[in-house]
Amino acid sequence: MFEVNPVLNKLKELSERTELLRGYFDYDAKKERLEEVNAELEQPDVWNEPERAQALGKERVSLENVVGTIDVLTQGAEDVEMLVSLAVEGEDEDTFNEAVAEADVLETKLVDLEFRRMFSGQHDGSDCYIDIQSGSGGTEAQDWANMVLRMYLRWGDAHGYKPELIELSDGDVAGIKSATVKFTGEYAFGWLRTETGVHRLVRKSPFDSGGRRHTSFCSVFVYPEIDDDIDIEINPADLRIDVYRASGAGGQHVNRTESAVRITHIPTGVVVQCQNDRSQHKNKDQCMKQLKAKLYELEIQKQNAEKQALEETKSDIGWGSQIRSYVLDDARIKDLRTGVETRNTQAVLDGDLDKFIEASLKSGL
């Protein structure tokens, strides 16, 4: 005899939770908007305005993810209930097991959609940049910054965010002094925004012939790419623009011509750099985009200073604002804000950050 009631109760709960999400995400309005977007994208002249067409394409993906998932959950619950009935009528254990497995799949989809409620910020759906800066400590700190860069690149690849190296400055002996990476995809900023802060490494340094333990720091600053229609006034007189030859271990992703651009916003001290294109003009445009985005994020932080642990500028992220400790000799990585801890240090350094990120988002950081 099959244990039917637990499965039916689970399906009932899934349906109730799906209905709640239908209201939370305003399903009807999103479905109507999806139809409008599809109609616009079918117009033959839509690509006369490439930026608008790209924005519509991005909006369609976002809408389809919500509308499509709710449709799958709604229809899926009905289908599984029918499978259960067929299994009971035919006393078919294989069909019943299939129904149980399908119910588990639906629950996973539902949990993923419920988690999207964490992304309620104005720019959570945006692409984003991560600035990585090594702390004091010479080669050991610069090697740690490179490890952090690799960690985020791996995370981005695993989640389909197409990480793009915008700027990289080599360390004196090994590692890097700084890097900027762009993450492109839905909710990139929403996922990564709580990673801003200082990451602390404790290990026996491979650069110390005595094998002593060293403590190193690396700061991470995450900020969203903002739309061009958001008004951020930048006075050209406030800018210092430097052109230099690109350097860095970026391989084929970093060019070597004298087209790299560095822009300093003198009033705030904010510095942005770009060296990933052979065109100085394109690098300058990219720098201005980053500068605009960074100044906007800093302004948002300033307005919400009482609620956020972030400082007003990247350079003000002090070594006291540590968010995570990586103690490799003891095989322990701990988030100092949420208490989440793991001993699988290599997996984290290979980009397995979801446990930490999800906990920080759920705690409202």
UniProtKB/Swiss-Prot annotation:
Top-level taxonomy: Bacteria, Pseudomonadati, Pseudomonadota, Gammaproteobacteria, Aeromonadales
HAMAP family: Rel_fac_2
Keywords recorded for this protein, A-Z: Cytoplasm, Methylation, Protein biosynthesis
Species assigned in the record: Aeromonas salmonicida (strain A449)
Gene3D superfamilies: 3.30.160.20, 3.30.70.1660, Release factor
GO-annotated cellular components: cytoplasm
GO MF annotation, one: translation release factor activity, codon specific
Protein name according to UniProt: Peptide chain release factor 2
Gene name per UniProt: prfB
Pfam family name, one: RF-1
Positions carrying N5-methylglutamine: 252
Intracellular or extracellular location(s): Cytoplasm
SUPFAM superfamilies cross-referenced by the UniProt entry: Release factor (SSF75620)
Primary localization class, coarse: cytoplasm
Functional summary from the UniProt entry: Peptide chain release factor 2 directs the termination of translation in response to the peptide chain termination codons UGA and UAA.
Post-translational modification: Methylated by PrmC. Methylation increases the termination efficiency of RF2.
Family the entry assigns: Belongs to the prokaryotic/mitochondrial release factor family.
